[in-house]
Design a protein with these regions (language model features):
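A short, N-terminal "cap"/entry segment at the start of jelly-roll beta-barrel domains
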Residues: 1-44, 125-131
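Conserved short histidine dyad/triad with adjacent acidic residue
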Residues: 35, 46-63, 98
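Short, charged/polar surface micro-motifs in flexible loops or helix N-caps
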Residues: 41-44, 52-55, 75-77, 122-123
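Structural motif
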Residues: 45-47, 66, 112-114
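Conserved GNAT-family N-acetyltransferase fold
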Residues: 50, 69, 94
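A short beta-strand-loop-beta hairpin characteristic of the jelly-roll/cupin
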Residues: 57, 62-90, 100
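Ligand-binding loop in jelly-roll beta-barrel domains
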Residues: 77, 85, 89-90, 98-125
Length: 131
């Protein structure tokens, strides 16, 4: 008898169907987060789309395996601890090294949206630090 294998179906997240407010205490104000990929296993990728109003910045944080941000729209800022804030525009991509202290957010006069990709370790993909 021939052996059949089933091909897994793609997982599709329809835009805007999973938008929720960010957790409290991780930024200067709440912003919208849409989970795209959730895999909290060690080394498993997580991905989300974030939309920030003008001037909203995350607090300083790190990711155990680093982070990639891909800018969708608006003007944003990315800052490595001790370095200058770099302006980001649609189509830009920025990566942060594992455990590198950084923050990112919307420029003062512009909304900002991006996709972030990061891998988890011990069930967590981020460690939030001081403001």
């Amino acid at each position: 008898m021939p052996q059949t294998t089933s091909t897994p179906s793609p997982v599709i997240h329809r835009a805007g169907t999973n938008m929720r407010p960010s957790p409290e205490g991780i930024a200067t104000a709440s912003f919208l987060v849409e989970s795209l990929v959730e895999n909290g296993e060690n080394g498993g990728l997580t991905a989300m789309r974030c939309a920030l109003e003008p001037g909203v910045m995350t607090h300083w944080h790190t990711h155990p395996h680093g982070q990639i941000l891909y800018v969708l729209s608006g003007v944003g800022l990315a800052e490595r601890f001790g370095g200058p804030a770099e302006e980001l525009h649609a189509g830009d991509c920025v990566s942060f090294a594992p455990n590198e202290r950084h923050r990112h957010g919307a420029a003062p006069e512009n909304a900002f949206s991006y996709i972030s990709i990061q891998a988890a370790q011990d069930g967590s993909a981020v460690t939030w630090l001081e403001e």
